[in-house]
Amino acid sequence: MKRIILLAITVAAMGMTADALTGDVNGDGTVNISDVNSVINTILTDGTSVAADVNSDGTVNIGDVNMLIEIILSGGADDDITPKEIALDDSELDEPAEVIPDDEDDLDYGDYVENTVWSTTVHIAFDGETATVTGNPSTVNVAIDGAHVTITTTTKRVRYVVTGTTTNGSLKFYSEKKFQLQLDGVDITNPTGAAVNNQCGKSFYLVINEGTVNTLRDGDNYTMVEDEDQKAALFSEGQILVSGKGKLNIYSTGKNCIASDDYVFVRPGCHLYLNSTSGHGIKAKDYVHIKGGVINMEIAADGAKGINCDSLVYITGGRTTIITSGTTLIETDGEGNPTTTGCAGVKADDNMTMTGGTLNIKCSGNDAKGINVAQPLLFSGGELNVVCTGKQKSIAPKGVKCDTDCTIQGGTFYSCAPKGRALDVDGTLTIADGYTTLNDADPRLLEISF
């Protein structure tokens, strides 16, 4: 409580007057230190007050004191800030011609499906409760149970082309070699697990054929197999390398939309729509690289992220729009202690770098962060728009949160958190010279243009 009073003293000389402002606890038309004192008195006496519940989370606690101080220091309540509108956008994107690396010594050479000669083509056709596989040589073993297809092979350079519709089917691959999966107008729903499950740790080239619309759905309850992962409607033990000029819609009600135990690479041209009520949009262990394409995500699960990576996140092109609506996930650990996990548009446990493209993020749930980065954040190009409209319930909402250093040196950077802070950097914040716009007078809004 001493800390609360000390914080209150620091803002004692500051205040503002407005009609019907959030934070006017005592109803005198002014938001100032007396309102902070009113909230503190309510807490000390275990009282109740609708007006003292400044962040509207149903309780009167330290969160309301903190929000009042933020309001006074910033000179206004959230009522006086109108954030940018952020909405899903599946319109065509004019992207520059992609340069395919042709030098085998290039580190990215193997990420491009064009750099492999595919010698075998296998066709998989779904039809309701059944599936048919044709063109497979004897070295590509096929097991079919209804419309659940399992491929087991050691054959190199196999291309699988999949078509048709099933509401109770799946594709599973056991392979020792990299392979290509072409989606050529397919709709797969697996009520008991992943729609596509790749148990191969090698490169998994996912090609979305031009002019096609494809859909993958998982189910609420996964039937787990011992010693096997299936963490998403589209899961791979190896890298997921997405290309093509078609559309892929993924709906997840059981786990994540896309998950890789390696990395995820999305190339220009494709259109992805990811909708999850149970987990993340994209989950990866190694890194996530968005080089291009149009990606739209709607993530509703508590504690979930649009992009969640155990390591690095790179945004170098395309247009990615992430909308989250979940709030904080509260669980208990093995000792019965509560743990909290907040929502975020992008969560990187290592560095995040953005050099191009457009990244739009809107988080409407309480406690959410637009971008949450554990290691240095570098923004050197492209367009970033982050809006977090949620309130503080157990974790402070932030537009962009960086646990170490943050460097902004190019592009257009916009972050707005009407009930929190636009940018929170625990290390050193560096804004390079040469900007044409710098709007940082209010801690809830930050705009920088170069």
Per-range role (PLM):
Residues D80-F450:
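A composition-driven surface/loop motif
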Residues T17-T22:
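Boundary at the C-terminal end of the N-terminal hydrophobic targeting segment
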Residues V25-T48, D57-I81:
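Alpha-helical segments with a strong preference for the paired helices of cellulosomal dockerin domains
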Residues D24-G27, K391-K393:
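Short, solvent-exposed loop/edge segments of extracellular or virion-exposed proteins
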Residues I4-M14:
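Sec-dependent N-terminal signal peptides
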